[in-house]
């Protein structure tokens, strides 16, 4: 993937924001207050509690309640006990607001560590943290969108900002691997949101187009669409004309729901639909009604993952069960990564020679090797500087039997990039599931 395509798609900052030094008043604090502050670690948490990506942050209030409970007695590091304060800001799913909230957490709240759940906000937040010398960890976006989106390279990385997640290349290996056994003509229709991750999947050199070409697929590229788009008639028409048996690309749930409705109205019925981002949540599949049966997706995390939390000791299955019993709602994939973000942050603080020394925390992150609820997070041994690549697989949503707790379940159908995660069944054609 080229750095230029990611920079253009992500709208990465071109001007650096610098810390403005405080006046004499900042130096005249009361000694007792200064001592209390020095024994409090302040963690900033930037997330999406509202807006178009609010479903990614839906579980955060619940998760934060449990993280705070785990940290109620503080952290004892080097013989000193530190209270831990978590300051939360909502990006409202807007990159510009994300930049503003990042600045507020760094300059007004003066956090010791910034954790960023919103990968779109991570672009501006990472640049601000690097300029101001504040350690940052982000997640929930392909690493290429962060590394290349900010004009860096796998060899260069960043001075203070880190990211853990899988890469777009891992998704493609799973998508194409999952389709390999299908007994259909290799015709593929693709469409992509015009944003950083969308450009990652559409990249001519390393994205879906190149993967399709290498494997003998005939691709009909529906191109990029703006996030506010609600008309996909051109894509539907071109896919139907090309008799595309498989539909793929990158789209959010609301986009796909509109596309699928228009496809059904036009009589277009592909045999497989594997759309990155669109089917991460059970609600997205449920919104399609019976048509949701058989939709396939990348999988970052499920209760089936054989990992446990370094923070609470819970297994993936136990964490998901905790959420379902507490809320009555089905588990979602971001639950695992939101939890892991705090696992990484807390581990770095514990491993730092001084958790109030930002360079020491940065160094601890650079050397981190942690077994977490989402799997191994290894910054130290990673060939991509400032990035830890985490395991991911692919799977298919299946309608459950009558009387089941939830209408759909996510079944793992391919694991070529993470064989430690067991496959549960093979991918089935939509026509097979419809006739079953």
Predicted region positions:
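Short, charged, surface-exposed loops that flank catalytic or proteolytic processing sites
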Residues: 350-363
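N-terminal secretory signal peptides
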Residues: 1-13, 26
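Extracytoplasmic "Venus flytrap"
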Residues: 44-67, 89-95, 118, 191-202, ...
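Solvent-exposed, acidic/polar segments of extracytosolic/periplasmic ligand-binding ectodomains
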Residues: 293, 366-436
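Extracytoplasmic ligand/sensor domains, especially the bilobed periplasmic-binding protein
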Residues: 111-223, 272-297
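C-terminal segment of N-terminal export signals and the immediately downstream linker at the start
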Residues: 11, 32-49
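Beta-alpha junction/loop-to-helix N-cap segments that form part of ligand/metal-binding clefts
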Residues: 55-62, 74-151, 225-232, 253, ...
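Extracellular/periplasmic periplasmic-binding protein-like sensory domains
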Residues: 263-339, 351-352, 407-409, 413-435
């Amino acid at each position: 993937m080229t750095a230029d395509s990611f920079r253009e798609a992500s709208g990465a900052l071109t001007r650096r924001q610098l810390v403005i030094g405080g006046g004499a008043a900042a130096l005249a604090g009361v000694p007792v207050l200064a001592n209390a502050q020095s024994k409090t670690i302040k963690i900033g948490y930037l997330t999406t509690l509202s807006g178009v990506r609010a479903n990614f942050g839906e579980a955060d209030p619940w998760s934060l309640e449990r993280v705070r409970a785990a940290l109620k007695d503080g952290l004892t590091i080097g013989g000193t006990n530190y209270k831990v304060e978590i300051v939360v800001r909502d990006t409202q799913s807007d990159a510009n607001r994300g930049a503003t909230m990042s600045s507020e957490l760094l300059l007004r709240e003066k956090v010791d560590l910034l954790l960023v759940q919103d990968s779109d906000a991570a672009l501006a937040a990472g640049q601000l943290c690097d300029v101001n010398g504040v350690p940052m960890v982000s997640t929930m976006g392909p690493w290429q969108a962060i590394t290349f989106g900010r004009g860096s390279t796998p060899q260069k990385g960043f001075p203070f900002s880190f990211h853990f997640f899988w890469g777009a290349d891992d998704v493609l290996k799973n998508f194409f691997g999952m389709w390999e056994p299908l007994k259909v003509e290799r015709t593929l229709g693709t469409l992509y949101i015009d944003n950083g991750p969308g450009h990652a999947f559409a990249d001519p050199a390393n994205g879906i187009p190149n993967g399709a070409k290498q494997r003998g697929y005939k691709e009909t590229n529906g191109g990029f669409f703006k996030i506010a788009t609600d008309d996909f008639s051109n894509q539907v028409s071109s896919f139907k004309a090309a008799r595309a048996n498989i539909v793929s690309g990158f789209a959010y749930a609301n986009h796909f729901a509109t596309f699928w409705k228009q496809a059904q109205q036009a009589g277009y019925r592909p045999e497989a639909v594997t759309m990155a981002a669109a089917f991460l949540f059970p609600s997205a599949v449920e919104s399609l009604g019976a048509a949701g049966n058989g939709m396939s997706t990348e999988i970052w995390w499920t209760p089936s993952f054989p990992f446990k939390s370094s923070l609470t000791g819970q297994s993936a299955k136990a964490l998901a069960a905790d959420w379902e019993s507490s809320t009555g709602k089905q588990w979602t994939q971001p639950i695992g990564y939101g939890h892991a973000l705090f696992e990484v942050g807390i581990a770095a603080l514990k491993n730092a020679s001084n958790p109030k020394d930002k360079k020491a925390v940065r160094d601890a992150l650079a050397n981190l090797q942690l077994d977490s609820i989402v799997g191994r997070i290894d910054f130290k041994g990673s060939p991509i500087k400032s990035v830890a690549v985490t395991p991911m697989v692919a799977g298919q949503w299946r309608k459950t039997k009558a009387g089941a707790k939830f209408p759909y379940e996510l079944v793992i159908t391919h694991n070529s990039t993470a064989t430690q995660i067991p496959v549960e069944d093979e991918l089935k054609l939509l026509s097979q599931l419809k006739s079953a």
